[in-house]
């Protein structure tokens, strides 16, 4: 069983909050993680079960009853949002920590029937698909070490083909163990089930084909800049509808929006966001890309590797709220794939290069940013599929992709 990095965060949150919401995409491992927690006394329910769901909806206050010292674990809380008000009533009468652990595959802020946010009573923990560091049982401190310019040595090798293979196989625990054909079928069923069943918890879908088209377009545009109006024109769907569907897909944790870094006073800084799929395997399998086709096609390889690096950086950043991920682009076509900002304002720039050959040209945007926009300390790294960490001037390093897993 793979140990999840967020296990300690969930346990810590249960000691601090009356209610904890463990949230993330379907099949990323929330229920498994909840079952691994060393809780003294628990009562568990899953709202995916129809009879359980009916019972919860018919008598929410009775359903959430608990004994002293007991943690009630409720899976897929978005299926019976009526329970949230009942839980609020219970915890307002009892300040004990760790009373309820609610897992969910939808962001409760976007669930249609939610009328109370449980603000001040609830702690939220995001779980993502398996990161490289979890698979390789790493320490999960890559970002911290990158800020310190203390890069790991003796890293298990990971060449371009190996990295693409990991990305295409995905970090979904069930899918990653399948062969390629079974995995593609799994992802098609996965996406269909989300759109047909789970989407109804978030928004009203009048045209399923339109929602499916928007999801396909977002996968195709994953890790690329685009305008919503452009997507609306190409898909033949109204702009407002596209915006509604994108919000719903984000609410189900199928996509993340990475906003632009805009804290400089340079007038040409771009203001467009990028969208990344929750997992690079979702992109490759739904779009029908084989590992060989990704390896042989630079555009596909770049897209998949950037998405894969994002999901790994995001898993690392989730471990500590002092980190925030953004991206940079300006009207002069200078681009930095990711800017990681620490709460004290110190910046880490991250570029992604699928290949193993690189040179000074690969650092030009990082060095320009450091000279013209970074107000204080700045470290720039290029993640590549080579074996060694190489220095390209003060504060600039080529770092093996495999370091993400240390």
What are these regions (language model features)?
Residues 30-31:
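Conserved lysine of the Walker
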Residues 84-102, 106-108, 115-117:
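Conserved catalytic/switch belt of AAA+ P-loop NTPases
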Residues 42-71:
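Short glycine-rich substrate-engagement loop in P-loop NTPases that contacts/grips substrate
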Residues 22:
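Hydrophobic anchor at the beta1->P-loop junction of P-loop NTPases
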């Amino acid at each position: 069983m793979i140990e999840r990095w967020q296990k300690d965060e969930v346990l810590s949150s249960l000691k601090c909050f009356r209610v904890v919401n463990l949230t993330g995409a379907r099949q990323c491992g929330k229920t498994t993680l909840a079952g691994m927690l060393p809780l003294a006394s628990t009562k568990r329910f899953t709202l995916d079960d129809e009879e359980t769901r009916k019972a919860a909806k018919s008598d929410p206050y009775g359903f959430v009853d608990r004994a002293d010292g007991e943690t009630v674990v409720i899976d897929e809380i978005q299926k019976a949002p009526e329970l949230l008000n009942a839980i609020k009533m219970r915890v307002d009468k009892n300040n004990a920590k760790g009373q309820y652990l609610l897992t969910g595959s939808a962001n409760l802020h976007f669930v249609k029937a939610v009328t109370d946010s449980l603000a001040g009573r609830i702690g939220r923990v995001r779980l993502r698909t398996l990161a490289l560091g979890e698979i390789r049982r790493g320490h999960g401190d890559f970002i911290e070490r990158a800020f310190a310019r203390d890069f790991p040595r003796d890293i298990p090798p990971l060449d371009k083909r190996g990295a693409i293979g990991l990305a295409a196989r995905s970090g979904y625990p069930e899918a990653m163990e399948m062969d390629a054909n079974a995995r593609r079928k799994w992802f098609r069923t996965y996406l269909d089930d989300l759109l047909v069943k789970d989407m109804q918890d978030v928004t009203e879908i009048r045209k399923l084909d339109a929602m499916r088209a928007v999801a396909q377009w977002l996968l195709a545009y994953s890790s690329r800049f685009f305008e919503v109006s452009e997507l609306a024109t190409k898909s033949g769907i109204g702009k407002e509808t596209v915006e509604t569907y994108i919000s719903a897909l984000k609410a189900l944790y199928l996509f993340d929006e990475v906003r632009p870094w805009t804290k400089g006073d340079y007038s040409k800084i771009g203001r467009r966001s990028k969208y990344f799929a929750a997992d690079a395997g979702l992109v490759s399998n739904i779009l029908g890309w084989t590992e060989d086709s990704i390896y042989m096609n630079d555009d596909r390889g770049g897209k998949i590797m950037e998405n894969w690096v994002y999901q790994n950086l995001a898993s690392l950043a989730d471990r500590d709220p002092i980190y925030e991920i953004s991206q940079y682009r300006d009207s002069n076509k200078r681009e930095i794939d990711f800017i990681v900002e620490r709460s004290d304002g110190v910046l880490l720039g991250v570029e992604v290069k699928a290949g193993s050959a690189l040179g000074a040209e690969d650092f030009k945007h990082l060095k320009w940013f450091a000279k013209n926009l970074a107000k204080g300390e700045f470290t720039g790294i290029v993640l590549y599929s080579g074996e060694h960490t190489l220095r390209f001037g003060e504060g600039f390093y080529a770092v093996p992709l495999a370091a993400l897993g240390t």
